[in-house]
A protein has these predicted regions:
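Catalytic cores and adjacent binding grooves of peptidoglycan-active enzymes
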Residues: 28-40, 149, 155-218
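Extracytoplasmic strand-loop-helix segments at the start of, or within, the mature domains
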Residues: 38-40, 110, 135-141
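Active-site acidic/histidine clusters and adjacent loop/turn architecture
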Residues: 52-121, 172, 176
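N-terminal secretory targeting signals
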Residues: 2-65
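Short, surface-exposed glycine/acidic/tryptophan-bearing loops
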Residues: 129-153
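Extended, low-complexity, intrinsically disordered C-terminal regulatory tails
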Residues: 47-54, 101-136, 184-201
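Extracellular/periplasmic catalytic domains that process cell-envelope and extracellular macromolecules
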Residues: 113-114, 137-142, 178-179, 203-206
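Short, conserved helix/loop micro-motifs enriched in His/Cys and acidic residues
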Residues: 74-91, 144-162
């Protein structure tokens, strides 16, 4: 038995409008073609300026610092206190040279390993440098940054233990910072990461991240 269906004038009008839009080349927002189109990536804005590192990493200040963005195509930031991404903006300041080095390593690493997680960046320093807090003896003049080791399971968050670290990729990150002139790289004593002994040094509480320091600019 065929049941007669009555369509109201409002519904009929909506159907005609949809049909007209499709005929003009407008795809339905629920079509297969539009469902999987990724949103365009936001442009990473950085206010570049010539920075000056004063004093030492353990007793210094930062003049005209540059803030690392909260995230980009090749990196994410992590707040070690709140234990979430992104890191708060006031914790992401460094010299322009430091920010450039971090972004360069992140970009080159992502290009070499598109299957790997983005590089995780932790604390840099304060906008004007100075004492950062009880968990940081240095990070005072814009030359230090914490960088998390990639995890074996590819999750974009810091590893909990050295056993979760992808040591092959972590060593490559160490090597990339060395190639760009890092003067100090602290690594976890339970991670067999290597480099020139005067630069790559084991230090407690660094089993989930490395601490990189660059030289001050001229």
């Amino acid at each position: 038995m065929v049941r007669e269906v009555h369509v109201s004038g409002t519904v009929r009008s909506l159907c005609l409008i949809v049909a007209a839009l499709v005929g003009c080349g407008f795809a339905s927002p629920f079509s297969a073609e539009s469902r999987f189109i990724p949103a365009p990536a936001k442009k990473t804005e950085i206010r570049w300026r010539d920075s000056t590192a004063l004093g030492t990493p353990g007793d210094g200040r930062l003049v005209r610092g540059v803030r690392l963005p909260s995230a980009g195509r090749s990196f994410f930031t992590w707040d070690p206190v709140l234990r979430r991404a992104p890191n708060r903006g006031w914790r992401r300041w460094g010299t322009d040279d430091l920010v450039r080095v971090v972004l360069r390593v992140a970009r080159d690493f992502a290009e070499a390993h598109p299957e790997a997680p983005r590089l995780g960046i932790g604390d840099l320093g304060l906008e004007r440098g100075g004492y950062f807090g009880p968990k940081h003896a240095t990070h005072q003049n814009g030359l230090d940054a914490d960088v998390y080791y990639p995890r074996l399971n590819r999750r974009e968050r810091p590893p909990r233990t050295a056993a979760q670290v992808d040591l092959r990729l972590a060593q490559e990150i160490v090597d990339r910072f060395l190639a760009l002139g890092a003067t100090v790289i602290y690594v976890g004593p339970n991670t067999p990461l290597t480099g020139p002994p005067a630069i790559v040094q084991p230090l407690w509480n660094h089993d989930n991240h490395l601490h990189v320091r660059i030289a001050p600019g001229p």
